[in-house]
């Protein structure tokens, strides 16, 4: 079946966290109305009543005429041409569990930087296999960026990834604003794995900071992380790619250094002496690096890396 991705294509976002909220804000600046699947009753009530997400980025106020929050997943997906997944990777299956509407005529975009636990598949791989979609109708939107700065109109760069460059350009138009600049890539595999690996590296940086290591050591740790990322991609999926550009290295740097980095924050708590369990309980947002670490170990074994 044919999918629609051009100017007239309608967008919907699945998820209600900080990144999902920031993405809806970008889309609402360009689109007449954005579908939004919100399964949390408190968040849904806040969006419908006040145009605010009371749990994440609560200072962001939406024009309620431009958003269509709903707890009916089928309705949201049915009315959309482009479906953007913006849930934590560990909860993607449960978010999509109620779905009975076919995705065959949809263009699906992953804004998730993680691996589906237990399946040991990236989001793109999982969507491809589970919903029988071609890789041509799956895209990625990634950083380097944090939701907090995007939502406040800070100059940011996003990377749009599709196997078809024309699709990437059309998808990018949905997100472009005067403060959002876009770069494009066809490296679906490389960009997605780079976004996964950088969360693990940021966790290690947080641990190092928590243990009292300084900038000298962090420079070595992050530089070697960048090298390991490049080698992983070369071994697992050889292709011509420049891992020094923003979609790879830039995303790694912002996640390792930013005060907004939840993965760095989790590592910091562990470095300060918290148990992993207590550190996770203290986090108000999901740190993807925690789930990704074990998944990458299995993937390394699969590829014999």
Regions found by a protein language model. Give the residues of each.
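NAD(P)+-binding Rossmann beta1-loop-alpha1 motif at the extreme N-terminus of oxidoreductases
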Residues: 1-60, 66-71
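Conserved active-site and cofactor/substrate-binding residues in soluble primary-metabolism enzymes
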Residues: 14, 18, 22, 42, ...
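Rossmann-like NAD(P)(H) cofactor-binding subdomain of soluble oxidoreductases
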Residues: 63, 70-78, 82-155, 171
């Amino acid at each position: 079946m044919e999918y629609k991705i051009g100017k007239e294509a309608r967008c919907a976002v699945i998820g209600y966290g900080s990144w999902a909220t920031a993405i809806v804000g970008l889309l609402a600046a360009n689109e007449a109305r954005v579908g939004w699947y919100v399964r949390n009753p408190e968040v849904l009530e806040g969006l419908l009543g006040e145009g605010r997400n009371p749990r994440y980025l609560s200072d962001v106020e939406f024009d309620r005429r431009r958003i269509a929050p709903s707890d009916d997943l089928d309705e949201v997906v049915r009315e959309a041409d482009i479906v953007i997944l913006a849930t934590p990777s560990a909860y993607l299956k449960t978010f999509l569990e109620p779905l009975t509407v076919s995705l065959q005529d949809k263009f699906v975009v992953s804004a998730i930087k993680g691996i589906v636990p237990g399946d040991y598949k990236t989001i793109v791989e999982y969507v491809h296999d589970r919903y029988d979609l071609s890789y041509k109708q799956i895209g990625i939107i990634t950083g380097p960026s944090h939701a907090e700065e995007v939502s406040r109109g800070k100059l940011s760069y996003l990377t749009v990834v599709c196997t078809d460059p024309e699709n990437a350009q059309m998808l990018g138009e949905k997100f472009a604003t005067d403060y959002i600049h876009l770069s494009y890539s066809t490296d679906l595999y490389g960009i997605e794995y780079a976004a996964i690996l950088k969360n693990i590296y940021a966790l290690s940086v947080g641990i190092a900071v928590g243990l009292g290591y300084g900038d000298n050591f962090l420079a070595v740790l992050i530089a070697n992380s960048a090298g390991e990322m490049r080698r992983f991609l070369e071994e697992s999926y050889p292709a011509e790619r420049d891992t020094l550009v923003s979609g790879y290295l830039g995303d790694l740097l912002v996640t390792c250094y930013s005060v907004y980095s939840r993965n760095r924050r989790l590592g910091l708590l562990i470095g300060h002496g918290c148990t992993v369990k207590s550190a996770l309980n203290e986090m108000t947002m999901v740190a993807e690096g925690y789930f990704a670490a074990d998944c990458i170990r299995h993937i390394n074994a699969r590829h014999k890396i």
